Swiss-Prot record:
Pfam families: IGPD. InterPro entries: IGPD_sf, ImidazoleglycerolP_deHydtase, ImidazoleglycerP_deHydtase_CS, Ribosomal_Su5_D2-typ_SF. This is Imidazoleglycerol-phosphate dehydratase. The keyword rRNA-binding does not apply. GO terms for molecular function: imidazoleglycerol-phosphate dehydratase activity. Keywords: Amino-acid biosynthesis, Cytoplasm, Histidine biosynthesis, Lyase. Transmembrane segments: none annotated. The lineage of its organism: Bacteria, Pseudomonadati, Pseudomonadota, Gammaproteobacteria, Pseudomonadales. One of its GO terms (biological process) is L-histidine biosynthetic process. It is found in: Cytoplasm. It comes from the Bacteria. It comes from Pseudomonas fluorescens (strain SBW25). Belongs to the imidazoleglycerol-phosphate dehydratase family.
């Protein structure tokens, strides 16, 4: 089996980002982004998706976190698209429900080749530790646009904003793990009746 790894660099006037992933990893993660809460959430993707992630970013954090958070999503999406290749043999679809105390979230993903995001998270606070939680919409939109996936994110309940977000990212990691997993019964076949994704 060919290694499903990729490294991508993004260099703009706002951010310089290097991202490396291994879809068949063990959940190892290393981050140097400068946005601790984002790094904490990315660690959930790695751990629960069993995807090795290494992301280094230098951005205009003196302005705010927006460009860095969005561009990390873009770069991660590009890395996924590159690592997954032609998509032959993958399960394609993934879903997960994850609870954390009072919070419960559901994430469903389709590596369809058609970008689309439906995200419904009724945050109970605007910030967590100074981090603007609205920026996660930008992160996921960037990921979706460049990984070329359809992604549905729903926080079904929760009163603690940190818990709401953490359940989303844990469910996202688990849904990714399911979707990118190779299915022995689909070996070498495209998971679509069209023959292409």
């Amino acid at each position: 089996m060919a290694e499903r790894k990729a490294s991508v660099e993004r260099d703009t006037l706002e951010t310089q980002i290097k991202a490396s992933i291994n879809l068949d990893g063990t959940g190892k993660a290393r981050f140097d982004i400068g946005v601790p809460f984002l790094e904490h959430m990315l660690d959930q993707i790695a751990r629960h998706g069993l995807i090795d992630l290494d992301i280094v970013s230098k951005g205009d954090l003196h302005i705010d976190d927006h460009h860095t958070v969005e561009d990390v999503g873009i770069t991660l999406g590009q890395a996924f698209a590159k690592a997954i290749g032609d998509k032959k043999g993958i399960r394609r679809y993934g879903h997960a429900y994850v609870p954390l105390d009072e919070a419960l979230s559901r994430v469903v993903i389709d590596f369809s080749g058609r970008p689309g995001l439906q995200m419904h998270v009724p945050y109970t606070r605007a910030t967590v530790g100074g981090f603007d939680v609205d920026l996660f919409q930008e992160f996921f939109q960037g990921f979706v646009n460049h990984a070329l996936v359809s992604l549905h994110i729903d926080n079904l309940r929760g009163t603690n904003t940190h818990h709401q977000i953490e359940t989303v990212f844990k469910a996202f990691g688990r849904a990714l793990r399911m979707a990118v997993e190779l299915d022995d019964r689909m070996a070498g076949q495209m998971p679509s009746t069209k023959g292409v994704l």
